[in-house]
Design a protein with these regions (language model features):
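Conserved small/polar residues in nucleotide/adenosyl-binding loops
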Residues: 103-107
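N-terminal glycine/serine-rich phosphate-binding loop of ATP-dependent small-molecule kinases
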Residues: 1-96
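Acidic, proline/serine/threonine- and glycine-rich low-complexity intrinsically disordered segments
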Residues: 99-101
């Protein structure tokens, strides 16, 4: 029986990683398949998360799984700091994604 793969994407304050887990004969194995830098953009003194870069790196990690021939049946993304991004009707970001603590006041 072929192993079944599950992809976890962990995005931290300074880097992100794609971890592929599989179950084979009752044994779990994990491997890091992709890693990328993460950081903030300074926009006129405002610290912003580079959401476009994060999204591009998530896609690159998924491509790496395909290159390895290890296609996950499910995927989960874990981040810290930004709890939400507002989207319009076309699923595009509305405004910037600020990397500051006062954004909790917008809810």
């Amino acid at each position: 029986m072929k192993p079944v793969y599950y992809l976890a994407v962990d995005i931290g304050a300074s880097s992100g990683r794609h971890i592929l887990a599989s179950m084979d004969n009752g044994r779990m194995t994990i491997e890091e398949v992709y890693r990328f830098d993460n950081g903030m953009i300074n926009d006129n003194g405002n610290k912003l998360w580079d959401v476009d870069s994060l999204f591009a790196n998530i896609i690159e990690g998924m491509k790496k799984c395909k290159e390895l021939g290890k296609i996950p049946v499910s995927m989960s993304i874990d981040t810290w700091a930004v709890d939400y991004v507002l989207l319009d009707d076309n699923d595009k970001c509305i405004g910037n994604v600020y990397a500051v603590s006062y954004t909790h006041l917008t809810l």
